[in-house]
């Protein structure tokens, strides 16, 4: 994946000094390519900072996006500057050894970027198909392993030419040509593009099928909210488990609660955003991976030098446009980008009116507002309150927990109820409520906050039970 093809090097295998550079052409190319490189570097840095500075974006999916941005940042900062100089001067000015290293890093970064998109497509399929099981299927440990596999496979594909898997290099060190050895071209094209592309297309086709099927289910008469958060509802009735010294009234022997399945809207929006990323990736890289194998196996069908350069830089363009796609397609990234650009990163403190958080503690302490024994769980750690609706003066919130076992601990006296309470703070709304319906053992038995799936919480404006 080096800029100059063999077409461009034919007749150039000589040792005399290169021709004089055309100044006007060099300035024009320098401005265009330099602007593209700066835009790509700054844009990918912005993506990384947006995730790093916003804890609600600290999820495995967004870590995959950061990995994609890191690969693109490495490409735009370490490979593209030399590609631009190569294009402007018309010859390679850095020697044979650096040419080989530069070409290997080029393949490494491009392959890591493409495989990163492949991992993201698999992640989105799991998120849309298994939204409730997603936190247990896609864990941070598995995410790290997936990213390590991405970079390991990318390294394997990129280092072949460094160990001699390439055509014989020309004697003139001012020529740094693409590796057109047929075996390596086939291997790299399959591993770097066609296999990941097949996986990406299959995953997104399945995402589309699942999303379409679920949307039909929601429209077929199942109970839904009339708000933006249309959801499937499963109503469950069961008796309370009696507890010694429980402060809960014995009259409430039956608990009526709703377990709402997450609608696919958030997952579908993320899939849509990443679908646009994949679409742009195909448009940018497919021409190159069509031209390169054809030119390697059928030399008589090599495209003109100008066409090859355009196709090659079109592939580079993909690493520069991803930062444009995120804010245009995702409200989360749009707000995160704005915060970073306004230098508001990490300025959200607990006392801020924009803070969102909740505290788990025994019910008796919830009423008094005490802080002893409370467990502060930050937003972005996997536990989130979603505002469902506001009708007739009632605010309804959904509590979703993907808390890993042992991630938070709390000790409760034996005379306390197994009911866990949550204090919600969002702008001017501050209430104390009770989450019911957990089927896990009482907290005092294992000294852990129960792993709560999904609960709906209905409160009046003054916090009264609804």
Swiss-Prot record:
One GO BP: positive regulation of MAPK cascade
GO molecular function list: alpha1-adrenergic receptor activity; protein heterodimerization activity
Positions in the Cytoplasmic compartment: 52-64, 123-143, 206-273, 330-466
Annotated function: This alpha-adrenergic receptor mediates its action by association with G proteins that activate a phosphatidylinositol-calcium second messenger system. Its effect is mediated by G(q) and G(11) proteins. Nuclear ADRA1A-ADRA1B heterooligomers regulate phenylephrine (PE)-stimulated ERK signaling in cardiac myocytes.
Modified residues (Phosphoserine): 215
Protein's organism: Mus musculus (Mouse)
Cellular component terms (Gene Ontology): caveola; cytoplasm; cytosol; membrane; nuclear membrane; nucleoplasm; nucleus; plasma membrane
Name of the coding gene: Adra1a
Topological domain spans for side Extracellular: 1-27, 89-99, 168-181, 298-305
UniProt protein name: Alpha-1A adrenergic receptor
Keywords for the protein's UniProt record, in alphabetical order: Cell membrane, Cytoplasm, Disulfide bond, G-protein coupled receptor, Glycoprotein, Lipoprotein, Membrane, Nucleus, Palmitate, Phosphoprotein, Receptor, Transducer, Transmembrane, Transmembrane helix
UniProt membrane topology term: Multi-pass membrane protein
Sites carrying sugar chains: 7, 13, 22
